[in-house]
């Protein structure tokens, strides 16, 4: 018997262009695409983006863009929101595994039962939730406008606030309004150590603590200023302080350094020595994945039309009330 040996088929790995920034710019023109990036993305992605912002700003940009393709450098619920607002546009996400611990903390079936147990309650949901949760909501909010929106609700109207309990408590403290809170949270913003922040304050007495309202109350109590990522950026720009301890995902420090390079920015430390103050989901997106998403026009984010229409109404109410 004669056995013929066959060489294994060599699958050549696709090569990246030497000038990745230039190649992305070329694809952007070719596709009539816009790149939207969250402040928590890696610096290279922020540098190639057309717009960098927080959830509210990104939603507003997605609602107003004339581009045919939206490349969303963020996490899945953000790309979903862009698709809800733009059903006829293609929405690309560099990595479909870029989820969100806060969104995942609110399963739709469980939330439906929770909502049924609190009839006659108005549902205000933080934008960090799935399309299914948005579809069950009356109004969507972001950390930029949550206080403003709650203040517009008649005082006799009971409210469910979901999914972030820490943001909900902060809004309650700011408005004096009692709300029923869904007990969800962000793994990043719950990892900051109050004890280590105090130690940093002793080492850097000139530094102001600034924090995102998704942080726990103990961390917020130590903060000189509390606000959304955009509000934190604006505060740093206006403050005379030479240094800041930043209690949010450290990706935002890239923009802080660009706007105010002479100031010192210290990421708030987590309880242990890991990099748990970095969002593992945001970090799944890379410049290379962004390039391949544009080159292949995939992976694409889609939302079933029935869910999209139900989720669109509360998002539109948010944009109107903002």
UniProtKB/Swiss-Prot annotation:
Positions contributing to [4Fe-4S] cluster binding: 100, 186, 279
Record's subcellular location: Cytoplasm
Ranges annotated as spanning the membrane: none
Primary enzyme class: transferase
GO terms under biological process: 'de novo' NAD biosynthetic process from L-aspartate
Details of cofactor binding: Binds 1 [4Fe-4S] cluster per subunit.
Biochemical pathway: Cofactor biosynthesis; NAD(+) biosynthesis; quinolinate from iminoaspartate: step 1/1
Amino acids binding iminosuccinate: 38, 55, 126-128, 143, 212-214, 229
Keywords for this protein: 4Fe-4S, Cytoplasm, Iron, Iron-sulfur, Metal-binding, Pyridine nucleotide biosynthesis, Transferase
The EC number(s) this enzyme carries: 2.5.1.72
Single GO cellular component term: cytosol
Keyword Transferase: yes
Catalytic activity field: iminosuccinate + dihydroxyacetone phosphate = quinolinate + phosphate + 2 H2O + H(+)
Main location: cytoplasm
A Pfam family assignment: NadA
Key word Lyase present: no
GO molecular function list: 4 iron, 4 sulfur cluster binding; metal ion binding; quinolinate synthetase A activity
Assigned protein family: Belongs to the quinolinate synthase family. Type 2 subfamily.
Protein role: Catalyzes the condensation of iminoaspartate with dihydroxyacetone phosphate to form quinolinate.
Protein name (record): Quinolinate synthase
Gene name of the record: nadA
């Amino acid at each position: 018997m004669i056995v013929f040996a066959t060489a294994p088929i060599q699958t050549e790995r696709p090569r990246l262009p030497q000038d990745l920034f230039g190649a992305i710019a070329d694809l952007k023109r070719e596709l009539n695409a816009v790149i939207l990036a969250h402040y928590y993305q890696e610096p290279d992605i922020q540098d190639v983006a057309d717009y960098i912002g927080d959830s509210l700003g990104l939603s507003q940009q997605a609602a107003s863009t004339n581009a045919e393709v939206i490349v969303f450098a963020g996490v899945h619920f953000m790309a979903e929101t862009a698709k809800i607002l733009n059903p006829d546009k293609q929405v690309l996400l560099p990595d479909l595994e870029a989820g969100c611990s806060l969104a995942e903390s609110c399963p739709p079936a469980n939330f439906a039962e929770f909502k049924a147990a609190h009839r006659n309650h108005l549902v205000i949901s933080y934008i960090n939730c799935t399309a299914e949760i948005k579809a069950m909501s009356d109004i969507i909010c972001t950390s930029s406008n949550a206080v403003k929106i709650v203040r517009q609700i008649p005082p006799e109207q009971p409210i469910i606030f979901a999914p972030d309990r820490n943001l909900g408590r902060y809004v309650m403290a700011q408005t004096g309004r009692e709300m029923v809170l869904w007990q969800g949270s962000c793994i990043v913003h719950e990892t900051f150590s109050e004890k280590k922040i105090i130690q940093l304050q002793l080492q850097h007495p000139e530094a102001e603590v600034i924090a995102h309202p998704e942080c726990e109350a103990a961390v917020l109590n130590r903060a000189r200023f509390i606000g959304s990522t955009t509000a934190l950026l604006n505060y740093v720009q206006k403050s005379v302080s030479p240094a800041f301890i930043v209690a949010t995902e450290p990706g935002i420090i890239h923009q802080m350094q660009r706007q105010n390079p002479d100031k010192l920015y210290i990421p708030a430390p987590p309880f242990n020595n890991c990099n748990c103050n970095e969002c593992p989901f945001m970090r799944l997106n890379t410049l290379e994945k962004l390039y391949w998403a544009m080159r292949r026009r995939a992976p694409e984010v889609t939302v079933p039309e029935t869910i999209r229409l139900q989720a669109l109404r509360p998002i539109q109410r948010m944009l109107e009330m903002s």
